[in-house]
Curated annotation (Swiss-Prot):
Reactions catalysed: Couples ATP hydrolysis with the unwinding of duplex DNA at the replication fork by translocating in the 5'-3' direction. This creates two antiparallel DNA single strands (ssDNA). The leading ssDNA polymer is the template for DNA polymerase III holoenzyme which synthesizes a continuous strand; ATP + H2O = ADP + phosphate + H(+)
Protein name, per record: Replicative DNA helicase DnaB
Alphabetized PANTHER family for the sequence: REPLICATIVE DNA HELICASE (PTHR30153:SF2), REPLICATIVE DNA HELICASE DNAB (PTHR30153)
GO CC terms in record: cytosol; primosome complex
Binding site for ATP: G229, R230, P231, S232, M233, G234, K235, T236
The protein's assembly and partners: Homohexamer.
Keywords, in A-Z order: ATP-binding, DNA replication, DNA-binding, Helicase, Hydrolase, Isomerase, Nucleotide-binding, Primosome
Alphabetized CDD domains for the sequence: DnaB_C (cd00984)
UniProt-listed SUPFAM superfamilies: N-terminal domain of DnaB helicase, P-loop containing nucleoside triphosphate hydrolases
Domain of life the protein comes from: Bacteria
Organism field: Rickettsia conorii (strain ATCC VR-613 / Malish 7)
Gene3D superfamilies: DNAb Helicase, Chain A, P-loop containing nucleotide triphosphate hydrolases
Role: The main replicative DNA helicase, it participates in initiation and elongation during chromosome replication. Travels ahead of the DNA replisome, separating dsDNA into templates for DNA synthesis. A processive ATP-dependent 5'-3' DNA helicase it has DNA-dependent ATPase activity.
């Protein structure tokens, strides 16, 4: 026989010189389907062994899909599924009549006599269904590549295909059943023991800021944390500080516990990776960003810059600055990072720049889809997800500028899905814009008030699903965009 080859014009697999198409049949095992259905009809208890992973659409034959679904409906009502009860439910169905349903059910019962382990048959049916879905995805990928317009980039098609493949690979794996309380207690005790052994008693990923850690106990796996603030409050700067601290603290913890080093992922939808790394360099080397942009540096500053650049280059810190990503693209890329680089924590700057998948005209619905997607990523990958968010302009219309939960844009869904909501607020920013004239009697009082809030940023924990809320004042060095502990005015030293 001649070797297989592809006909380029028709994309049909051929196995001879005449390019005759090879008839290919979708993978299935009709006999296994018949034997399993017969066994379940003989003993309804067997349904419990396969129903957790096997659904009606996993069957290849349409009549078998209908029979399995009917069995599920009957047993859900507390009744016994038998050929007689099935016949009364399906008697008006055209397909059931076409296969002479009564006789066919009797045939299934007869075939069940040869069934030894029904679970094996269920797994065979499930596995073949996955393979058929894999074929469908492959065909869709090919068709989309042939028929795509210039508006759809190849990279977007790859991510779409990757997402479908990942969902297929994960099918059935994320469906958790009841867990015995003893197992949950063991997991809780293990977390408590880890906290007791840690000198800082932090269970989650340390923020590198003592007072904030005392309030939050670090960032916890599967949590969605929203960090919100008005422009110029320092949202991105604070997020960069948290990300760098997390990267260093995870590394130390991983080394101590002899674990694989975890990485930080940072989706920067607004700033370029170069702008973000320039901020990091400014922060770590303590060189103002203007000097870095203009290149006006003395030898001492330049040597300091090179040293910090070398240190940062060794970190497991990954930046994706692709603009206008969809929530599905973020999920796909986060999964890839988890697989390739052991992603430990994810930052997104910022929420309102993410595109929804459904392209709803209702922005509140779209934000709801996005926040639910981010929470799903946190749970699926078992990592903390920190998403930055804008606040509405209503803050600027009030005398008291301190933000509240109602100030969140599309606040209902964000507040609902988040485990923690934090606001960043700098009273110094607003006071400097209200300076009275130098000779004014109010100037002295204004100056006294300004001195009290100088270089202070308040982190307002407005929602904390598993802990206390309240205000955490931090030291803020505006020149280098560094956040530290207020009492000691020190920064994370890792």
């Amino acid at each position: 026989m001649a070797r297989n080859k592809i006909n380029n014009e028709t994309n049909i697999l051929a196995d001879n010189e005449d390019n005759l198409p090879i008839p290919r049949v979708l993978p299935s095992n009709v006999q296994a389907e018949q034997m399993l259905l017969g066994a379940i009809l003989t003993n309804n208890e067997l349904l419990n062994y396969v129903s957790e992973f096997l659904r009606d659409e996993h069957f290849f034959e349409p009549i078998h899909q209908k029979i399995y679904k009917a069995i599920e409906k009957i047993t859900e009502k507390g009744l016994t599924a038998t050929p007689i009860t099935l016949r009364s439910m399906l008697t008006q169905d055209e397909l059931f009549q076409e296969v002479e349903g009564a006789e066919y059910l009797a045939k299934l019962i007869t075939m069940s006599m040869m069934v030894i382990n029904p679970l094996d048959y269920g797994k065979i049916i499930y596995d073949l269904a996955i393979k058929r879905n894999l074929i469908n995805i492959g065909e869709e990928v090919v068709n989309n590549a042939y028929n795509s317009s210039l508006e759809v980039e190849a990279k977007e098609q790859i991510e779409h295909a990757e997402a479908k493949l990942y969902d297929l690979a994960s099918e059935g794996l994320n469906e958790k059943s009841f867990t015995k309380i003893g197992i949950s207690i063991s997991e809780s005790l293990a977390s408590i023991n880890r906290a007791m052994k840690n000198n800082d008693h932090i269970i989650g990923i340390s923020t590198g800021l003592i007072d904030l850690d005392n309030k939050l106990c670090g960032f916890h796996n599967s949590d969605l944390i929203i960090l919100a603030g008005r422009p110029s409050m320092g949202k991105t700067a604070f997020a960069i500080n948290l990300a760098l601290n997390a990267c260093n603290n995870m590394r130390l913890k991983n080394i101590r516990d002899n674990q694989e080093i975890q990485s930080v992922g940072f989706f920067s939808l607004e700033m370029s990776s170069e702008q973000l790394t320039t901020r990091l360099l400014s922060m770590c080397a303590e060189i103002d960003s203007t000097s870095l942009r203009t290149g006006i540096l003395g030898e001492e500053k330049y040597n300091r810059l090179r040293k910090e650049a070398n240190t940062l280059s060794e970190l497991q810190f990954f930046i994706d600055d692709t603009p206008a990503l969809s929530i599905s693209a973020i999920r796909t890329r986060a999964r890839r990072m988890k697989r390739k680089h052991n992603l430990g924590i994810l930052f997104i700057d910022y929420l309102q720049l993410i595109r929804g998948v459904s392209k709803s005209e209702n922005r509140v619905s779209e934000i709801s889809e996005i926040t639910q997607g981010l929470k799903a990523i946190a749970k699926e990958l078992n990592i903390p997800v920190i998403a930055l968010s804008q606040l509405s302009r209503a803050v600027e219309l009030r005398e008291d500028k301190k933000p509240m939960l109602s100030d969140l844009r599309e606040s209902g869904t964000i507040e609902q899905d988040a485990d923690i909501v934090m606001f960043i607020y700098r009273e110094e920013y607003y006071l400097t814009r209200k300076e009275p004239a130098a000779g004014d009697a109010k100037h002295a009082a204004w100056l006294d008030k300004l001195n009290k809030v100088y270089n202070i940023a308040d982190i307002i924990v407005a929602k904390h699903r598993n802990g206390p809320v309240g205000n955490v004042p931090l030291y803020y060095d505006s020149q280098f965009s560094k956040f530290g502990n207020l009492e000691t005015r020190t920064f994370n030293s890792n």
